[in-house]
UniProtKB/Swiss-Prot annotation:
It is found in: Cell membrane. Binds 1 pyruvoyl group covalently per subunit. Its cofactor is pyruvate. The record marks 251-252 as: Cleavage (non-hydrolytic). This is Phosphatidylserine decarboxylase proenzyme. It is a peripheral membrane protein.
Amino acid sequence: MKKRLFIISQYLLPHHLLSRLAGCIAECRVRWFKNAFTRWFAKQYQVDMSEAQVEDVTAYEHFNAFFTRALKDGARPLDPTPGAVLSPADGAVSQLGPIEHGRVFQAKGHSYSVLELLGGDPALAQPFMGGDFATIYLSPKDYHRVHMPLAGTLREMVYVPGRIFSVNQTTAENVPELFARNERVVCIFDTERGPMALVLVGAMIVASIETVWAGLVTPPKRELKTVRYDEAARAPIHLEKGAEMGRFKLGSTAIVLFGPDQVQWAQELAAGSPVRMGQGLGLGLPKA
């Protein structure tokens, strides 16, 4: 009964209003408030500040600065294995595996369309049909910057408006096509393994999503927006393997997609496996 009421509330709550309010709180610079709130959060979620560049939680100008904190050099070593595909973020594997019949597995009894996930453009979705995916969930205690699984050159970025349901095991199991319904930012890179999609999915009280090249991406009008970066008028944007590409100001989930016969995920990884940014998720397959 409790679970059912929680799911019903997800449909009834004013998602974007709550997220705007959360954003105001997260940007508050009133010292006594932001210090008390940040201390409470760090204690409540057992945040490990020993690996942060700035360990004192009260030294951050606002909660968002704390939440998107940088780590000390060497805190996240990159897997040196040749051909390793890195985890883009700290968190836990939500799901990973093959993309079958154009759909990505979400949870028992649920999947969602690659086409819808990427914003509805068939040309964008086609290279990933029959490929592989990995979904990483970032919990509140985790490091919330997202990094490159492989070196890549940005080709296209798509902001896809949508709902902002909470993201957790309960909603994954009960909200159909959760990740293809929530607000998200789709980034398409050209890599040594062909096209790679890195999708940053928002969630309830996720105030904003940023990228290192565009800054704040989530626009106030909440309209589908596509920006192409492979045009002659734009300087190429190339990011090295392990480089930061974006961050969440609260929440949520990063999804990586590859085309067919490009990667093989590590056999020891499964739903629920903890991962850290820079850890190997799998290996690139030998080229034919």
